[in-house]
Regions:
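N-terminal amphipathic alpha-helix/helix-capping segment at the start of soluble metabolic enzymes
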Residues: 1-14, 99, 103-116, 350
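Metal-dependent enolase-superfamily TIM-barrel catalytic cores that perform enediolate-based chemistry
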Residues: 116-237, 242
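Metal- or metallocofactor-binding catalytic centers and their adjacent structured scaffolds
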Residues: 24-103
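Conserved, mostly hydrophobic/aromatic
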Residues: 3, 28, 51, 89, ...
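Ligand-binding pocket scaffold of soluble enzyme catalytic domains
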Residues: 21, 27, 32, 100, ...
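Shared catalytic-loop signature of beta/alpha-barrel
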Residues: 46-51, 65, 214, 220-223, ...
Length: 361
């Protein structure tokens, strides 16, 4: 089995941009991949075309060697555009390997340590009341977690407050106050057994994160996500000295080296690995195993489509250190025209079927 071509499919559908790829082989098998930064589509496509020339004629089973060729081949370390291109190709190579031996990806990764993976949706709202209503609806649908963004990060603001501010602007003091009010109301609405996740989306500084965590501590959130900007992972060292709530971070980091400090110094509790940015299955599995040695669970970042979802759930099914899996759209209800065969979902859990590779078509 040799690689013959890589096809690119930039798409805009259902209000978002996506970039899927197919790695074609001389025996007719095709592997699917997905790019993590589709909004940078033209740049990523150029990177994929550049990498394609290095991969023609290569054996997909030699994925570790091919990963090293892609990552090291330009001398300079790849940024997020190249790492996203590498990620999509690497995921497609693993999909091909599974298809070539008629085995699901999670079995190639060591076999299942769980038969399903607990997931969380995105529960948004243009007002706090809408957020509360959507959270209650998610629980009624079977979800065991609810997640929303720091006020104004995803447009979740009181209507009266929104009219007084510039659209898209986040005032930290007011945002922290609103986030506290929202968490109190959501906790009251969904009960004590549902996990609450607040995504700060890297929009606060250390002092305001400490204030936020002090205020919401009584509501026992499952974690606070990406509270600080990602350029300086060492900033989590100072935060960890003052915050007792679990912290999740890492969705913007594009290699295992960017995770090094927060894992080695135990600065986070959950590693938000993005398989479609960090380097694909090959790199994500290494980070997962590394995190396990520090008793850090993974919470794979998955804001994308069916390919990303299948790759994430495959990794989680084959890994012991898993917290929860992001799943913004319930599998089987999203992009069915593109992928009529997808992973399964029921009552807040997702799992891969015993179809070869990623298990989607």
């Amino acid at each position: 089995m040799k690689i013959t071509e890589i096809k690119k499919y930039p798409l805009a559908y259902e209000g978002r941009e996506s970039l899927f790829i197919e790695v074609l082989t001389d025996n007719g098998l095709k592997g699917l991949g997905e790019v993590g930064v589709a909004k940078m589509g033209n740049a990523v496509i150029a990177a994929i075309e550049h990498l394609e020339q290095r991969l023609i004629g290569e054996d997909p089973w030699e994925s570790e060697k091919l990963w090293q060729i892609m990552f090291r081949g330009n001398f300079f370390p790849p940024g997020v555009i190249y790492s996203s291109a590498i990620s999509a190709i690497d995921i497609a190579l693993w999909d091909l390997k599974g298809k070539s031996v008629n085995l699901p990806l999670y079995k190639l990764l060591g076999g299942p340590v769980r038969n399903k993976v607990v997931c969380y949706p995105h529960t948004q709202g243009s007002t706090t009341q809408e957020l509360v209503d959507n959270s209650k609806r998610a629980v009624e649908e079977g979800w065991k977690f609810v997640r929303w963004g720091q006020p104004e990060t995803h447009g979740v603001l009181e209507e009266a407050e929104l009219s007084e501010q510039m659209p898209g602007k986040l005032e930290p003091i007011e945002s922290v106050r609103l986030a506290t009010e929202q968490m109190a109301l959501v906790r009251e609405a969904v009960g004590d057994e549902i996990g609450l996740l607040l995504d700060v989306h890297t929009r606060l500084d250390t002092a305001h994160v400490i204030d936020l965590c002090d205020r919401v501590k009584e509501f026992k959130p499952f974690f606070i996500e990406d509270p600080l900007r990602s350029e300086s992972p060492h900033a989590y060292r100072n935060l960890s000295k003052h915050v007792s709530l679990p912290i999740a971070a890492g969705e913007q980091w594009s290699s295992k080296w960017q995770f090094r400090q927060v894992i080695e110094e135990d600065l986070i509790n959950y590693a938000r690995i993005d398989l479609c940015i960090v380097g694909g299955i090959t790199e994500a599995k290494k980070i997962t195993n590394w995190a396990e040695t520090h008793y850090i669970d993974i919470v794979p970042h998955n804001p994308l489509g069916a390919v990303s979802a299948a790759a994430c759930v495959s990794l989680c099914m084959a890994s012991t250190n898993v917290g929860v899996q992001e799943m913004p759209r319930r599998p089987g209800t999203d992009s069915n025209d593109l992928f009529p065969v997808q992973i399964s979902w029921e009552d807040g859990y997702a799992w891969c079927n015993d179809l070869p590779g990623l298990g989607i078509e």
